[in-house]
Every structure is written in structure tokens, then in C-alpha cells.
Amino acid sequence: IITTLEQAERDRIIINSKKYEERALAPVVSAMVGGSPHFPSGYRLKKQTDNFIWISYDTQFTSQGILIYKYPVVAGKQMMGLDEILEENAEMLKNNVPGMFENTYMMTSTFARPSIKYMKYKGRDFAEIRGFWEVYNDYMGGPFVAHAFYNQDGTEMIVMEAFVYAPKYDKRHYLRQIESVLYSF
């Protein structure tokens, strides 16, 4: 029953996201990964490189962000395992998501090992990773959920990671909102 309720809420958020979509973001993401989630109004592009995009919805007290990145598949190497995904994730975060101070950057928390679950949604196989992020050498952190999957021709891994920073608030609602954006891909 809980899964059914979560799916109904996710579908409601996706419908709303499509209705009030921040349309300028779709071409940016599509150019890099061949498709795009539906970003609700208010989301803004924070950073873009050839293989990395950071999109965020920020308020005075909260931040909901989505990191989208890709990297080449290495022939003969397991690419969908948790350790392999986290290894690439560590490099992407360190190079692209700086903290507020020198020698600070976003990283996957080592406090609790993230979990991985293999799923199929709308015909797409993907690995869902859940865990916590933190800022190296600083006191920020929160939950994240990521979807990792192969591109259409199987030559690249694509990772879409949704994260929440809301130090004064319960993060469940914020995470479910932004997780719905991932499912709209």
C-alpha cells in the first residue's frame, strides 16, 4: 500500500512538473544525455560542462539540487556496481561541486554506506542509490537519491543525483519532490 501511495504522489508531482515546467532546462540536459527530466518552475542552471550539469531550486532556507553527469563505459569492467558508481561519483563531486570555503567540496558521506537497488521503470533498467552527502571540511549534509543507467547505445553511464539541503526541516518531503523529477526522465 505504501508503494502505491508513493507512486500516486510521484505521478501527481510529475504531472504538475510537466504543467509548470522550466522549459529552458530541457534542451541543455537533452544535448548532453539525449533526454531530460521535467524540471518544475523555479529550477535554475548552476553549472554546465561537457559531462556535468548542476540544476538547483534554492530558497532562503533550503536547496534541492540535481546533478547530471556521464562518463564512458570501460569494456570488460562492471559499471553498475555500487563501488564503481561511488568511485565516479566521488571524482565528479570533488571536481564540480565546491563548498563555500577553500578546500571544501561535496562528497558521499562515509558515515553510513549508501544502499543500491536495481529497478525497472518505464522500460528503463537502472540502479537506484540512496545515502547521505556531506561537505568535506565543513558541516553541511543531507540525503540523496541517484539513478544510474546506460545511455541508449551502451557507451556511457549516466547518473542523475537528487539531493536536499534543509537544515531546519524534515527532509522527506523535499527528497520525494526532487526524486519525482528523476522519475520524470
Predicted regions and their residues:
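Surface-exposed amphipathic alpha-helical segments
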Residues: 1-16, 37, 43, 157-185
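N-terminal "mature-domain start" segment
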Residues: 18-47, 183-185
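Long alpha-helical, hydrophobic tracts
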Residues: 28-34, 42, 60, 120, ...
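Secretory pathway targeting signatures of secreted, lumenal, and periplasmic proteins
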Residues: 40-100
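Short, flexible beta-strand-to-coil junctions
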Residues: 59-60, 71-74, 133, 163-168
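A short, polar/proline- and glycine-enriched secondary-structure boundary/capping micro-motif
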Residues: 65-67, 140, 170-174
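Long, compositionally biased interface segments
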Residues: 83-101, 105, 171-185
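Signature of long, low-cysteine stretches enriched in small and polar/charged residues
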Residues: 95-154
